[in-house]
Design a protein with these regions (language model features):
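Membrane-embedded beta-barrel scaffold of Gram-negative outer-membrane proteins
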Residues: 1, 106, 114, 148-187
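Residue-level preference for beta-strand/loop junctions
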Residues: 12-14, 32, 63, 95, ...
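Membrane-embedded beta-strands of outer-membrane beta-barrel proteins
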Residues: 16-20, 67-69, 99-101, 115, ...
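A structural preference for long, well-packed, hydrophobic secondary-structure segments
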Residues: 62, 80, 94-98, 103, ...
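Outer-membrane beta-barrel domain signature, especially the mid-to-C-terminal portions
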Residues: 51, 59-61, 98, 123-153, ...
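Face-selective signature of the C-terminal outer-membrane beta-barrel domain
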Residues: 1-93, 175-177
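Outer-membrane beta-barrel strand-turn architecture
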Residues: 24-30, 72-77, 97, 105-109, ...
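Membrane-spanning beta-strand positions in outer-membrane beta-barrel proteins
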Residues: 31-37, 79-81, 102, 106, ...
Length: 187
């Protein structure tokens, strides 16, 4: 046993986010009342991790500038949402567009049916938790990002049915939900 004095070090991980959002409600947008939402976001993460005994020094600055928008048409029985997000990550040379869509149908006031699609990504970067998870088991990992890494992509589909019923002062709820997620370029 005993402690491994080489395993000690210092980590700082400072993250901050700022953004703004605008919402506009239409009495009628093409065929139905709608709410438009648009906005901007900026996210920065500064990670420094020094493990002196193993000569492992990590310094990483991540900056992500984003713009997002969506329009949701809705009435009592239907809602249909189309939206997207543009992200520019400083560790990638291109902008990523992530679309999303959602459909809701209420055939009765006690039944809610939904279907949704979304696309997402994760940029190749070192995460603080990846640097230290092996330490818990008594080993140390040396992490270096490969130069040819591309973003990890995900596509998700989900469907659900939600039923509600009241018995006097009590309400019951039955939710049945299924989803599928496909990952590509996993790192």
């Amino acid at each position: 046993g005993g402690q491994d004095v080489n395993a000690y070090g210092a980590t700082t991980d400072f993250t901050w986010v700022t953004g703004s959002q605008y919402i506009y409600s239409f009495d009628k947008c093409f065929f139905m009342p709608a709410d438009f939402t648009g906005g901007l976001e900026y996210n920065q993460d500064n990670l420094t991790d020094d493990m002196w005994g193993y000569n492992r020094y990590t310094k990483q600055e991540v900056r992500i500038a984003s713009a997002f928008f969506q329009n949701e048409w809705k009435n009592k029985q239907w809602s249909f949402l189309l939206g997207g997000r543009l992200d520019k990550h400083n560790m990638m040379d291109h902008v990523i567009f992530s679309p999303r869509a959602n459909l809701r149908y209420n055939p009765t006031e006690n039944m809610n049916l939904r279907a949704s699609y979304s696309f997402g990504f994760r940029a190749p970067q070192a995460f603080d938790e990846d640097l230290h998870i092996e330490n818990v088991g008594g080993t140390v990992s040396m992490i270096e990002l490969a130069k040819d890494l591309t973003e990890e992509k995900s596509q998700s589909l989900s469907i659900s049915g939600d039923l509600y019923h009241r018995w006097g002062d009590f309400q019951g709820n039955l939710l049945i939900e299924g989803f599928y997620t496909s990952l590509s370029d996993v790192f």
